[in-house]
Amino acid sequence: NDAAAAFVLMSESTAKERGLEPLAYLKAWAKAGDDPRNPPKAGNKAFKLVLKKAGLTIDQIDLFEIQEAFAAQCLYNIRSLEIPLDHYDRINVNGSGISLGHPLGATLALRVTALVHEMKKRNARYGMVGTPGAGGVACVGIFERP
C-alpha cells in the first residue's frame, strides 16, 4: 500500500507560543522486541509495558488503535491484554490495517492521527495506539486528551 502521513509533536510551551491547542498529550510510550517468528509476543510486551509506565489499567483506556496487518495478530493482543468484551466497541472504531491498508512507513502516523481525532470526537480521555510487532519489534503509545 502507498500512503503518506505526518503529525506534529511539540512541547506544551511551544504550542502556547504559537497559539495552538494540543489535540492530545503523549502520556507514555514503550517499545519491545521478541522472536520475529512470533510477532504478537513483542506487541503483548509493549502494550503491557506502556500501561505500567502510564500507571493505567486496561479498563481506563477509552479507545484502542491496534494495527491489524493480520487478524490473528490483533486478536492475540486483544486477548492477551484481556480487553473486556464490553470494550470491543472501542477497538479500531474506524477500521484497521486490513480494511484501511498498511503502508509500512506511514502506518503508525496514520493510526496516531486517527486515534487523537477520534478521541476528540468522542471526548475520550485515554487512547492507546500500537503496532503488534512486525518483525519482532513493537511500539505502543498512550495519549491523553487535555
Describe the function of each predicted region.
Residues N1-P146:
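Claisen-condensing/thiolase-fold acyl-transfer catalytic domains that form or cleave C-C bonds
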